C-alpha cells in the first residue's frame, strides 16, 4: 500500500501531512519515527494526520505526532497549514480545525497568510500542568543560566525564559534538560526570549519530542503572553523566530490570535517500508560476510 503526502511548513517548521479522512491510517510509533527521520525517511518536525471531525462544528480533526512518536495536543504552524488546505479545497475563508485540546477557528487572509484563534492562554499551574503548586508568573524551574520560568498553557505546556541575548543560549544542551524537568509531568516546550522592543521579541525554541525547530506557533503565543504578564511588552507583538516572524495578539477575553504564512514544499508517496505494520523487523547480521 502506498500513501500520498504533502510536505508543508510554516516558517520552516515542517510537516508531513497525511489525509486519513477516508482511509484510516493508525500510525505506529515506529512508523512515525521512520517517516520523520531526516536521513532515511521524509524528514519533518511533526507528522500531521487529517481525520474525520469528532465535533459537529469542525471541518476535520488534526492529529499531531512528534518525531519520537509521542503525540502533541497543539501546533500553531501545523494548524495554519491545515486550515489553508481546507480553505483552498472548499473555497471558504473560515475553517474550524479540531485538535485533542479543542476547536481552533481559522481565517484565510487575502495575502495567503492565516490567522488562528489559538484559544485562551491557560495560566493556572494545574492547566500547564506543573507537578506542584506555583504562581506560573515565576516558576522555580531552571538549568544553568536559564532560571525563573514563566509558564503558559497553549494546548501544550510552555516554559518561557527571558534573556539578554537569545543567540548566546546553548539551547541544544539546556533544552532537553528543561524539557524533562521534574516540575513538568508531561514534559515541556522551552522558549528563550529576548525583548527587542515593546512590540518585537526574538525567540528560539526547543520543542518537546522534536528538539530545536525553526518556528513554533504555540510557543510564540506563550512567549507574547509571558512577556505581557511581566510588563515587558504590550499585548501584541512580532515574534522573530529562526524561520521568520509571526504576529501575535493577546485579547482582553484571554484568547490569543496568531497570524503567519504557510507554504507547500512538495508532494510525494510513502514507500511500504515506512507505513504502519510494514516496517522491516531487525535481522541479525550473518556470522560471516560474503567476499
Swiss-Prot record:
Catalytic activity, as annotated: (2S,6S)-2,6-diaminopimelate = meso-2,6-diaminopimelate
Major localization listed first in the record, in broad terms: cytoplasm
Any Pfam family from its record, for instance, is: DAP_epimerase
Q: Does the keyword Membrane apply?
A: no
Q: Which GO terms describe its molecular function?
A: diaminopimelate epimerase activity
Residues annotated as the enzyme's active site: 75 (proton donor), 216 (proton acceptor)
Binding-site residues, substrate: 13, 46, 66, 76-77, 156, 189, 207-208, 217-218
In which pathway does this enzyme or protein participate?
A: Amino-acid biosynthesis; L-lysine biosynthesis via DAP pathway; DL-2,6-diaminopimelate from LL-2,6-diaminopimelate: step 1/1
| Site, as annotated: Could be important to modulate the pK values of the two catalytic cysteine residues | 158, 207
Q: Does the keyword Amino-acid biosynthesis apply?
A: yes
Q: Where do transmembrane segments lie in this chain?
A: none
Q: Give the GO terms filed under biological process for this record.
A: lysine biosynthetic process via diaminopimelate
Q: Give the matching InterPro entries.
A: DAP_epimerase_AS (IPR018510), DAP_epimerase_DapF (IPR001653)
- Which cellular component terms (GO) are annotated to the entry? cytosol
- EC number(s) for this protein? 5.1.1.7
The record ties this protein, via Gene3D superfamilies, to:
Diaminopimelate Epimerase, Chain A, domain 1
* This protein's UniProt keywords: Amino-acid biosynthesis, Cytoplasm, Isomerase, Lysine biosynthesis
Regarding protein family, the annotation reads: Belongs to the diaminopimelate epimerase family.
- Please describe the quaternary structure of this protein: Homodimer.
Query: What is this protein's function per UniProt?
Result: Catalyzes the stereoinversion of LL-2,6-diaminopimelate (L,L-DAP) to meso-diaminopimelate (meso-DAP), a precursor of L-lysine and an essential component of the bacterial peptidoglycan.
Could you identify this protein by its name? Answer: Diaminopimelate epimerase
Q: Which organism is it from?
A: Rhodospirillum centenum (strain ATCC 51521 / SW)
Q: What is the gene called?
A: dapF
